[in-house]
Regions:
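Bacterial N-terminal signal peptides
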Residues: 1-11
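Early extracytoplasmic/lumenal segment of secretory-pathway proteins
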Residues: 18-83
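A structural signal for short loop-to-beta-strand junctions that line the ligand-binding cleft
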Residues: 68-72, 90-135
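Ligand-binding "clamshell"
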Residues: 83-91, 109-110, 115-118, 209, ...
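Short beta-strand->loop
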Residues: 90-101, 151, 247-263, 272-275
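Ligand-binding pocket segment of bilobal, Venus flytrap-like solute-binding proteins
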Residues: 165-180, 184-254
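Conserved C-terminal helix/tail region of periplasmic/extracytoplasmic solute-binding proteins
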Residues: 220, 328-359
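Mature extracytoplasmic/periplasmic domains
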Residues: 267, 272-333
């Protein structure tokens, strides 16, 4: 990942009075390999870089207060948007960031719906929730598998046949439930109890065939051939394909945006309201607004950058891939997640517990 990596141990290391230390909390495999080391070399700021694999983990730490983190990178909707309402994030003045003009104005406009004036968050990576498929293994068990449809996973007769080669699903109700609602032709932002029950019923019917719910380890499961079908994040699944190719194991992993449409999400940099080093956090944001820096990250994570100026430096195989940079036609089928009320969030979490336990 980078020069200074501190695994999550629940607390952020203390710094001496003399040294400058920035505490960053980000997703696993979500930054260019040289970004941290080069930032430290240029600025003299040491980086403690902790990892998480669920938005809920970040939200809980920030809500508890005194997390010690200066930069976090949660999914903008619903997590940053909800955190803004709760006062969890500090304001960022775009006029003080030289690289702000490098950002994609379309993405900023989408974020402004939940953050007026774009005062709290800076786009990092834009991606989708979709299907990771080992095509050879899937077609061996299901010759006429609908590779471009959620039917491959959500129809029990298909999931039952693919159980033998391994099915995984994101352990994230805020990502999965809206996708299932959209698949059913219902409003993915709905908080109606009967809609939640309908999505729960669909997932309970395929629960016996899901090997595990996981939001990070499935990358290696796909890359190693231990899983043949995953509902996951586009960036993770493309990384799995790259790892499989590099290993020369004969495993091929394909990412597909379902034809029914799916969730598109924006992960964004934000500064916690009680960040101990907000000035260093701004230096980090400014550094990462450079096109060449953000392009390095986009190339490493195989994702779509929120930095428009970086696009010319992103690998052509990524920018030409409609599964990563969707066509206008596909864009029309995508939706952003809801900012769920606290009450609905609790109901959805209870439903998710039922789904995972199969009861």
């Amino acid at each position: 990942m980078g020069a200074v990596i501190a695994l999550v141990i629940g607390t952020v290391p203390a710094a001496s009075a003399e040294e400058k230390v920035l505490n960053v909390y980000n997703w696993n495999d979500y930054i260019g390999p040289g970004v941290i080391a080069n930032f430290t070399k240029e600025t003299g700021i040491k980086v403690n870089y902790d990892l998480y694999d669920a938005n809920e983990t970040v939200e809980a730490k920030l809500a508890a207060g005194h997390s010690g983190y200066d930069i976090v990178v949660p999914t903008f909707v619903p997590f940053v948007a909800r955190g803004i309402e709760a006062g969890l994030y500090a304001k960022i003045d775009p006029s003080k960031l030289k690289g702000w003009s490098n950002l994609d104005t379309g993405i900023l406009a989408a974020m402004a719906k939940n953050d007026a004036g774009n005062q709290h968050a800076v786009p990092w990576i834009v991606a989708t929730v979709g299907l990771g498929i080992n095509v050879k293994k899937v077609q061996a068990l299901l010759p006429n598998a609908p590779l471009d449809s959620l039917d491959i996973l959500l129809k029990p007769e298909n999931a039952e046949k693919l159980k033998a080669c391994g099915i995984t699903m994101l352990d994230s109700p805020s990502d999965v439930i809206p996708v299932v609602l959209h698949y059913l032709g219902r409003d993915p932002n709905s908080e109606k109890p009967d809609d939640l029950q309908a999505a729960t019923d669909v997932l309970l019917r395929i629960r016996p065939y899901i090997r595990k719910f996981d939001s990070s380890g499935y990358i290696n499961d796909l890359a190693n051939g231990d899983a043949c079908l995953s509902l996951g994040y586009s960036t993770d699944i493309v990384i799995a394909g790259v790892r499989a190719k590099d290993a020369k194991s004969g495993v091929e992993v394909s990412y597909r945006i379902p034809k029914e449409g799916t969730l598109q999400y924006i992960d964004a940099m934000a500064i916690p309201a009680d960040a101990p080093h907000p000035d260093l956090a701004l230096a980090w944001i400014e550094y990462n607004l450079r096109p060449q820096v953000m392009a390095e990250t986009a190339n490493a994570v195989n994702g779509r950058s929120g930095n428009k100026a970086a696009q010319a430096m992103v690998r052509p195989d990524l920018t030409a891939n409609p599964q990563i940079y969707p066509t206008p036609e596909v864009e029309k089928t995508l939706f952003t997640g809801p900012v769920a009320s606290r009450g609905y969030d609790r109901l959805r979490s209870r439903a998710w517990t039922r789904i995972k336990s199969g009861t």
